Amino acid sequence: MAKKHKIAVLPGDGIGKEVVPEGLKVLDAVATRFGIEFQWDHFDWSCDYYAEHGKMMPDDWKDQIGQHEAIFFGSIGWPATVPDHEALWGSLFKFRREFDQYINLRPVRLMPGVPSPLADRKPGEIDFFIVRENTEGEYSNSGGRLFEGTDREVVIQESVFTRIGAERVLKFAFELAQKRGKHLTAATKSNGISISMPWWDERVAEMAGNYPDVRWDKYHIDILCAHFVQHPDWFDVVVASNLFGDILSDLGPACSGTIGIAPSANLNPERNFPSLFEPVHGSAPDIYGKGIANPIGQIWSGALMLDFLGYPDASAAVVKAIETVLAEGPRTRDMKGNASTAEVGDAIAALVRAG
């Protein structure tokens, strides 16, 4: 008898409400073809919930979803009614911190039918992963303001790095590199950030000693961004601190054509808590309700979830179906087509079912 996987479904705001159903449609097709059983538990925590309750989620949110294997997440944010920092820190960042989702994983891959803004790049030439530390570093939320509103105003925000935090993300990245092309690149800025980044470099070098078969190098973040644009074929696995990983994980998908179809995973590799899978794109209030949002980022995030749950063949089937639709259509308007959100979801689900 197949194991039933309990998944918390949070569409969130804006186009999250439109693309999540398409992701579920494809995952249901996967379930039929591969004999996987899902239990979808739906939660309406969003900026709409905030408008009614004054907070993004109920006080017992952790009890409600803490026993699920994964969270299938749409998008969060409705700036017209809720400031972005309140929406993010009241939901998504809580999941990352309190569920110890210390790995943010983003594939960077040039797909068929998606033109890269980089001249003459073809599918197969851009194919790597960005591994971002997701719970500490530059995004510590530690600091404050003094003498607000005066000419003496001082603002301090501190970075917080821990040995356990750095070592576990580096271990994950080196092990991923071992499974792929045995090449790891570390992002740094130790020529300008004189305490935390030299320490980060030391941790990378120390961890590399455990993986003698993995070739590794490091670049300062400024030149690394340039290399992403000029030489994206150099990379296989790129590991970075929270801030630098945040920058790179938007730049990478942009180099491969569009961040509009990019997926991401926020992982607790030990599976002590649920991991979260979401598209990179935001809630896009400007197109919400028009039925034109591209669902591929959400569907591809579902493929990452399948891989994490132990179904690599099912994950590969979804990615193959995505590639076919990107190459042959139907496409949404952002991809120079005229298909609706649902039509793209239908096409990918049909390809998955057909095998």
Task: Annotate each PLM feature.
Residues A8-K25, V30-A31, T150-D222:
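Glycine-rich phosphate/diphosphate-binding loop of Rossmann-like nucleotide-binding domains
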Residues D13-G16, E69, V131, A173, ...:
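Buried hydrophobic positions in well-ordered alpha/beta secondary-structure cores of metabolic enzymes
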Residues G23, L27, V204, Q298-L306, ...:
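Buried hydrophobic packing segments
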Residues G35-D59, F228:
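N-terminal beta-loop-helix "entrance" segment that forms/cooperates
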Residues A51-I156, L243-G245:
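N-terminal glycine-rich phosphate/adenylate-binding segment common to multiple enzyme folds
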Residues G113, Y219-A226:
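Short acidic loop-to-helix transition motifs that present clustered carboxylates
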Residues T135, N141-T185, S190-S194, P312, ...:
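Glycine-rich phosphate/pyrophosphate-binding loop and the adjoining helix
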Residues F228-P330:
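Glycine-rich phosphate/nucleotide-binding loop
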